[in-house]
C-alpha cells in the first residue's frame, strides 16, 4: 500500500531518543483525539494549520541563529566522516518560522504526488478497515506535520531548514540528521531517484501492475534514507552527550567521532525501546494504527536495518553499497538477513481485468507488503499472532475499481468500490490462518455481515451492506473479492488463479 513520504523531515516524536537531561520540556498539547479516529480533535481545532503552542515558547534569536549556522559545516563534516559520503559542496541553511513551515507544507500538499496517491487510497484504506470511516486524512496529515516537524531538508532547493521554535539543545542533533540527507543528495540525487515513481503515480491506476511494482520499492527506499540519517543522529548523540561538542573560544570545536552504534549495538535497541514507551498526547500517538506504524517505520525499522548492515559490512555496505543495490520490499527492511542473503520476494502482479471496464473504472491499486500485512493482522488479532504470521508473507497486491455512474450520498461509503486483494504465503497452513483472520475482520469493516453459502471448495462467502465478499484459499494463495456480483467475482477469482498457476509453471521450467 502507498506510504506517505515525509519529504526528509525530522519529527518531534524522534526527540524521545535524546537523553532526558538534554531536552527542554515541550509545550503541553491539547487533549488527544480518540484512539484510531483523530476526528473529534480535527473538528474542534482550526484545520490546515500547525497547532499553536498552549504556553509561550522560546523563539531562536538572530544571535542564536547565527551561532547555530556556524555549526553547520562542522556537523556536515561529522556526518561525512560517519557515513563515508563525501562533501561535494557546502549546504545552504535557513531559519524558518512556523508560518513559513505552514506555507511549505501547504505548497507540498497541493501537488505532491505521494500525498495525492495516499489520499486517493483513503477510501480503499477505509474499505480494508485500516482507517475509520469518518476520518479526514488530508486535514489530519496537515495538522500532524504542523505538530511534528522539527527540521527538514529541501532536496529541490538544496537547503537545510531549522525551525525557530525548536529548543536550542535539539537543533544540533536535528542538523546531523538533515545534513545526512544533504550528503545523500550530493552523491545520489534524491530528486532524480524518485522521478520515475512520480511519473507512474501521476498516471494513476490505469496500469495497476506499474503501481504494484513501485509501492514496496518506495517503502524500502524511504527506510534507507531515514535509517541512515537516524544512525548519524544516534552517533552524534553518542559523541556529544557528555559535552563533547563544547570547547573554549568562539569557533565551533571539532566533534569527536570516537563512538558509534557499531561499538554500542544495544544503543539502537535502547533508543527504539524508549520511543515505544514514549506514548503521549500528540496526534501521532493517537492516530489510527496504520498511520502510526507507517509514518514511523522508515525511522525506526530503517535505523535497525542500517545498524545491521554496519555490523555486517561496515560503512561501505551501510551507506554506499546499499544505495547501489536497494532493498525492494519492506520484508528486507524488517528482516535484514533476507537482504544480506539476496532473497527477494517479487511483486505479485495481477492479471488483465479489462472485462470490468464496461461497468467499472480504475480507482486504485498497489502492493500489500509484509509491513502492511503486519499492520492488518495487528488491527484484527493479537500482536503476537501478527509477529508470528507476517514473516510468512510471500507477496500481495490489490486492485480497486469504482462502479460507473455511482454517486454515493455519503462520501465515506465504499459500497460502490469493488476490491480484489491477493496474498501469497510461505505455506498452505499460513494462508489458511490468514484467510480465517481476514474473514473475522468483516464485521468490523462492514454492516450487516452474514455467512452465506459457498459452493466451491476452499471458499467462504459473506453477505454485507457493501455487497458479497468471497474469500478463496487455494494452496498458499488467498484471494478476497469484495462488492462484486457473484458472476463477476467468480471471473475475477478464476483470472487470478489461472495467472498464478501459469506463473508457477513458468518458474518450474
Task: Locate each region found by the language model.
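Sec-dependent N-terminal signal peptides
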Residues: 1-22
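Catalytic zinc-binding patch centered on the HExxH motif and its immediate surroundings
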Residues: 102-116, 136-157
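Extracellular zinc-dependent metalloprotease catalytic-domain scaffold
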Residues: 80, 89, 93-96, 118-134, ...
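Short pre-active-site segment immediately N-terminal to the catalytic Zn-binding motif
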Residues: 146, 158-176, 216-221
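Envelope-exposed proteins and targeting segments
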Residues: 89-91, 147-149, 156-158, 170-172, ...
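Hydrophobic/aromatic side chains embedded in well-ordered alpha-helices
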Residues: 15, 171-175, 421
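Soluble, non-membrane globular domain cores that form compact, hydrophobic packing
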Residues: 28-87, 98-113, 164-165, 179-419, ...
Amino acid at each position: 500500500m502507498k506510504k506517505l513520504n515525509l519529504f526528509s523531515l525530522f519529527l518531534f516524536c524522534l526527540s524521545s531518543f535524546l537523553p532526558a537531561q538534554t531536552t527542554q520540556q515541550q509545550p503541553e498539547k491539547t487533549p488527544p483525539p480518540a484512539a484510531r479516529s483523530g476526528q473529534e480533535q480535527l473538528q474542534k481545532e482550526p484545520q490546515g494549520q500547525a497547532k499553536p503552542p498552549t504556553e509561550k515558547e522560546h523563539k531562536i534569536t538572530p544571535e542564536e541563529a547565527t551561532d547555530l549556522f556556524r555549526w553547520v559545516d562542522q556537523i556536515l563534516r561529522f556526518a561525512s566522516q560517519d557515513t563515508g559520503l563525501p562533501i561535494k559542496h557546502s549546504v545552504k541553511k535557513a531559519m524558518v518560522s512556523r508560518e513559513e513551515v505552514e506555507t511549505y507544507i501547504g505548497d507540498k500538499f497541493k501537488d505532491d504526488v505521494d500525498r495525492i496517491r495516499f489520499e486517493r487510497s483513503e477510501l480503499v484504506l477505509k474499505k480494508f478497515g485500516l482507517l475509520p470511516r469518518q476520518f479526514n486524512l488530508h486535514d489530519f496529515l496537515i495538522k500532524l506535520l504542523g505538530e511534528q516537524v522539527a527540521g527538514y531538508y529541501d532536496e529541490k532547493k538544496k537547503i537545510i531548514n531549522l525551525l525557530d521554535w525548536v529548543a536550542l539543545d535539539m537543533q544540533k542533533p536535528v542538523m546531523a540528521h538533515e545534513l545526512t540527507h544533504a550528503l545523500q543528495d550530493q552523491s545520489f540525487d534524491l530528486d532524480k531517484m524518485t522521478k520515475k515513481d512520480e511519473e507512474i503515480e501521476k498516471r494513476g491506476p490505469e496500469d495497476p501492475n506499474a503501481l504494484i511494482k513501485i509501492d514496496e520499492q518506495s517503502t524500502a527506499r524511504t527506510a534507507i534514507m531515514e535509517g541512515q540519517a537516524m544512525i548519524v543522529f544516534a552517533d552524534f548523540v553518542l559523541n556529544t552527550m557528555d559535552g563533547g561538542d563544547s570547547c573554549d573560544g568562539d569557533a565551533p570545536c571539532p566533534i569527536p567521532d570516537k563512538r558509534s552504534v557499531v561499538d554500542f549495538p544495544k544503543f539502537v535497541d535502547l533508543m527504539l525501546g524508549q520511543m515505544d514507551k514514549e506514548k503521549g498526547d500528540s496526534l501521532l500517538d493517537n492516530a489510527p494504527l496504520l498511520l502510526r506504524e507507517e509514518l514511523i517505520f522508515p525511522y525506526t525499522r530503517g535505523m535497525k536495518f542500517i545498524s545491521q548492515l554496519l555490523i555486517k559490512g561496515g560503512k561501505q555496505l551501510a551507506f554506499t553499497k546499499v544505495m547501489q543495490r536497494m532493498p525492494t520490499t519492506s520484508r528486507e527492511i524488517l528482516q535484514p538477513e533476507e537482504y544480506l542473503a539476496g532473497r527477494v520476494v517479487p511483486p505479485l502482479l495481477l492479471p488483465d481485468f479489462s472485462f470490468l471496464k464496461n461497468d467499472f473504472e480504475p480507482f486504485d491499486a498497489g502492493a500489500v507488503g509484509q509491513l502492511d500485512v503486519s499492520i492488518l493482522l495487528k488491527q484484527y488479532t493479537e500482536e503476537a499472532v501478527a509477529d508470528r504470521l507476517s514473516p510468512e508473507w510471500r507477496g500481495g497486491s490489490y486492485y480497486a475499481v469504482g462502479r460507473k455512474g455511482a454517486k454515493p450520498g455519503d462520501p465515506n461509503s465504499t459500497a460502490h468500490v469493488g476490491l480484489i486483494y491477493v496474498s501469497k504465503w510461505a505455506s498452505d497452513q499460513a494462508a489458511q490462518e490468514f484467510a480465517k483472520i481476514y474473514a473475522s475482520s468483516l464485521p468490523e469493516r462492514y454492516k450487516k455481515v452474514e455467512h452465506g453459502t459457498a459452493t466451491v471448495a476452499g471458499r467462504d462467502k459473506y453477505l454485507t451492506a457493501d455487497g458479497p465478499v468471497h474469500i478463496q484459499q487455494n494452496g498458499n494463495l488467498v484471494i478476497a473479492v469484495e462488492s462484486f456480483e457473484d458472476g463477476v467475482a467468480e471471473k475475477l477469482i478464476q483470472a487470478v488463479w489461472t495467472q498464478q498457476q501459469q506463473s508457477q509453471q513458468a518458474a518450474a521450467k
